[in-house]
Curated annotation (Swiss-Prot):
EC number in record: 3.1.4.59
PROSITE patterns: GGDEF
GO molecular function per UniProt: cyclic-di-AMP phosphodiesterase activity; hydrolase activity; metal ion binding; nucleic acid binding
Binding residues for Mn(2+) 2: D352, D421, H445, D500
Name of the gene: gdpP
Segments for region (DHHA1): 590-646
Membrane-spanning parts: 12-32, 33-53
Domain of life assignment: Bacteria
Protein name: Cyclic-di-AMP phosphodiesterase GdpP
Organism: Geobacillus thermodenitrificans (strain NG80-2)
């Protein structure tokens, strides 16, 4: 303050006024000395008063600033020690040099000085030393503390966010969740019942669902004979997930006692606040659950993540063919509106994919449109390769086969693209065709997965069907003009059915035999089917070696794996899994081996007690309840086996690891 006061620039105005006043007083002496004397005395008095006033003001201001500085310092010290923010200073060895009282109270200590961070909290020490961020929530003695670290200054701030985190937790667990419950086969089960039996079945299902809703605190409202709306929250949803949605089993078991097994599909929307968006998510989840065959729960979050529960039973075969007739008519109209049709299956097509594609090509030709099969002859399994060799003998049919590069050149905005035996964009032969095509049709028999082709104009997915070839055969039957198949075309479709049903032993319904009967009547050669499916001696020996390495645990889970340096094709891996399933005591089989494309392939089979589709989905794959597969990249066979065992353990949730 004194330096400020003594600065000359500060005193210049006073000097100037004093000099001016003295000059005026001296001037008066020239005219009249008495007036000059009085003026000089007056100027002296005023000058004295001004200097005295300035010095007094300076002292008062200095005292005020001194008092203010003391109070600010005192408040700062009190704030550092008393405010509800923890402050901590570290030395170069990560020992505490200083901390305020709030932080000491958090650790329930009198003083923290001299202690190391590791003594107080290992997570805190790890965060300060190796943390990738400058802030983190850490729990200390029951409190949630937000820690902000300034590493260069070795300074840490601690904010108590316990109440905030509790409010956030309550908000999250009380957030609204919407569910749509659908009775999968209610209409089919009750259509043959009299009024009394139908009323009893209706009352049974309603009472089971109402009891379940009351137990969990769910609001349940029936909106139609086969549909309910349920309102719950995230906390209740967590409880339902822990129970693995036992209501699915309860409804199935209770109705089975009345010789009419009804199954549920539940679509749940969660993770958003908007009610219209919740409703959209719930309906989308229900469509997903139904597309996977029903008898399961699909939970879709706002971020797009989907979880599945249930799916313990095979989809029930639909007794009505109305849908097949409607789809056949719609497909005919789409073909008629297109300039040409491209037909594409999945990568490394098997007999079902290739047979279904040949069947669709026949549908296209029967509607007088140009059609092409998109296939890479060098990338097919052994059976499909033999079928392609047979196709080469028929010039007209072989001329319809084109490579993916040719398809990219042929496609126009009016071209219809039909995808068979898959619905996943990542699995099609040429993914770029999906982005070039404006009109896409999907025909598949696999349970619908989270990944799906975007915006198809027609979807025909029936998980109850044995194969895509079965679905295509029915579409052929309902074409308005009677279609006459050649021997090879009928044989290709029949071979697709035989492969996917394991010679009519798995997933075979009455409509499967109807389709096979139709194809046989069209001239399908069963001997040629066997020739197409023949296995080489070398493959037989490889399969036997894989089976020899199989280990079967006490739960009936069989796992076989190849050596790290052995490469087997996917067909051989699948055949080995099929063979393992025929062994006594085996309820599910898994075969792991390196593939030719560098990935590790896993084929899974079951008799129905274990849902291998769900297990494979945990590894990024998919399929059916009894037949599924997955491909893992950048892993060894041993690492793939470990991931598989973890997925099996997660599936059983609490069961002993296999």
């Amino acid at each position: 303050m004194s330096h400020f006061y003594e600065r000359k620039t500060y005193r210049y105005p006073s000097y100037a006024l004093a000099a001016l006043a003295v000059l005026m007083a001296v001037s008066l002496f020239y005219f009249q000395w008495m007036l000059g004397l009085v003026g000089l005395l007056g100027v002296g008095f005023l000058l004295y008063y001004v200097i005295w006033s300035q010095r007094s003001l300076h002292k008062e201001l200095q005292q005020y600033i001194s008092n203010l500085s003391y109070r600010v310092k005192k408040v700062s010290e009190e704030a550092l020690m008393q405010m509800p923010i923890g402050i901590l200073l570290l030395d170069e060895e990560d020992k505490i040099e200083w901390s305020n009282r709030f932080l000491a109270a958090c650790f329930k200590e009198q003083t923290l000085i001299g202690r190391s961070l590791a003594e107080l909290s290992e997570p805190l020490a790890a965060f300060v030393k190796k943390g990738k961020t400058d802030e983190e929530i850490i729990e200390l003695n029951g409190k949630q503390l937000k820690v902000i670290v300034h590493r260069h200054e070795r300074l840490l701030y601690f904010f108590d966010v316990t109440e905030h985190m509790e409010l956030r937790r309550r908000y999250e667990i009380e957030r609204l969740v919407l569910a749509i419950i659908f009775l999968d086969n209610y209409d089919e089960i009750t259509q043959g019942m009299d009024d009394q039996a139908k009323s009893q079945m209706n009352s049974l299902v309603t009472s089971v669902l109402n009891r379940w809703a009351n137990d969990y605190g769910i609001f349940l409202k029936r909106t139609s004979s086969d549909r309910f709306i349920a309102v719950l929250n995230e906390h209740i949803l967590t409880q339902l997930e822990k129970s693995k949605f036992s209501i699915l089993d309860e409804v199935r078991e209770q109705t089975a006692k009345h010789q009419a097994q009804i199954t549920l599909s539940i679509g749940i929307g969660a993770g958003v606040s908007s009610l219209p968006e919740l409703g959209t998510l719930a309906q989308s989840s229900l469509d997903l659950a139904l597309g996977r065959g029903g008898d399961q729960v699909a939970i879709k979050q706002g971020n797009g993540k989907v979880k599945f529960y249930g799916g313990k039973t095979n989809p029930m075969e639909k007794r009505t063919r109305v849908r097949a007739r409607v789809i056949s008519h719609a497909l005919r109209e789409l073909i008629a509106e297109s300039d040409k049709v491209l037909i594409m299956g999945h990568k490394y097509p098997d007999m079902d994919a290739l047979g279904a594609a040949i069947g669709i090509l026949k549908v296209v030709q029967s509607n007088q449109k140009e059609g092409f099969l998109v296939v890479d002859a060098m990338k097919t399994d052994a059976g499909a390769q033999r079928l392609l060799e047979e196709m080469k003998k028929q010039a007209d049919l072989w001329a319809r086969c084109i490579k993916p590069e040719q398809a990219l050149e042929l496609i126009t905005e009016d071209t219809l693209l039909i995808v068979v035996d898959t619905h996943r964009p990542s699995l099609v032969i040429e993914e770029r065709l999906l982005y070039r095509a404006d009109h896409i049709v999907v025909i598949d028999h696999h349970r619908r997965g989270e990944e799906f082709i975007e915006a198809p104009i027609l979807v025909y997915m029936e998980p109850y069907a044995s194969s895509t070839s079965e679905l295509v055969t029915e579409l052929l039957e309902y074409q308005p003009k009677r279609v006459k198949l050649s021997m090879l075309e009928a044989t290709a479709l029949l071979a697709g059915i035989v492969v996917d049903t394991k010679s009519f032993t798995l997933r075979t319904g009455s409509r499967t035999f109807d389709a096979a009967s139709y194809l046989r009547a069209q001239g399908a050669d069963t001997v040629l089917v066997q020739k197409l499916l023949r296995e080489s001696v070398a493959n037989y020996v490889k399969r036997a070696k894989l089976i020899e390495r199989a280990a079967i645990d006490e739960h009936g889970i069989a796992i076989a794996k190849g050596d790290e340096n052995e490469v087997h094709d996917q067909v051989l891996i699948a055949q080995t899994a099929d063979t393992l399933l025929t062994l006594s005591g085996v309820v599910a089989s898994f075969v792991i081996s390196k593939r030719g494309d560098g990935t590790v392939g896993i084929s899974a089979r079951s008799l129905g007690d274990v849902n291998v589709q769900v297990i494979m989905e945990r590894l990024g794959g998919g399929g059916h309840l009894t037949n599924a597969a997955a491909q893992l990249s950048d892993v060894t066979v041993g690492e793939a086996e470990q991931q598989l065992r973890e997925a099996i353990h997660d599936y059983f949730e609490g069961g002993k690891p296999v």
